[in-house]
Amino acid sequence: MEKKIAVTAGTFDLLHPGHFNTLNFAKKHADELVVIIARDETVKKIKGRSPVIPEEQRKIMIEALKPVDRAVLGSLTNKLEPILEIRPDVIVLGPDQTTYQINELKAQLAEHSLYPEILKVEDYVKCPFHSSYDILKEIVRRWCCKELKV
């Protein structure tokens, strides 16, 4: 019997409970979890800023997490490329993905005769720092005008 493979993707810059929630959710739906790490250049284009942590280091950190079996860097030219190479049975999307984005992804994958189950994490993890951006803002608030004591 073949292993059921799940894929999820993201920047995974400053890790927070939402990342762990998504990874654990994805692993519950498959035997093997492959995580696609967004490239630094791609993040800068989409978010208007580079990640704090470089892509290779983010990949190493994600690979070290318990639910993750393997991490790969995304493509610089075609966001579907790693998905088409992995050919997962399940794709897990975060809670911030819209129905339009999900339907668009299904259509794009169908063009390549790929029909994975697409699952969306519905619940946000409620905590003070539930996004990498919130963590970064808090670091700046606490430390930008103070002398760092090492």
UniProtKB/Swiss-Prot annotation:
ATP binds at residues 11-12, 16-19, 96, 124. The keyword Flavoprotein applies. The gene is ribL. Pathway: Cofactor biosynthesis; FAD biosynthesis; FAD from FMN: step 1/1. This is FAD synthase. GO terms for molecular function: ATP binding; FMN adenylyltransferase activity. Homodimer. InterPro entries: Archaeal_FAD_synthase (IPR050385), Cyt_trans-like (IPR004821), FAD_synth_RibL (IPR024902), Rossmann-like_a/b/a_fold (IPR014729). One of its GO terms (biological process) is FAD biosynthetic process. PANTHER family: FAD SYNTHASE (PTHR43793:SF1). It is an enzyme of class 2 (transferase). Keywords: ATP-binding, FAD, Flavoprotein, FMN, Nucleotide-binding, Nucleotidyltransferase, Transferase. It comes from the Archaea. Gene3D superfamilies: HUPs. Belongs to the archaeal FAD synthase family.
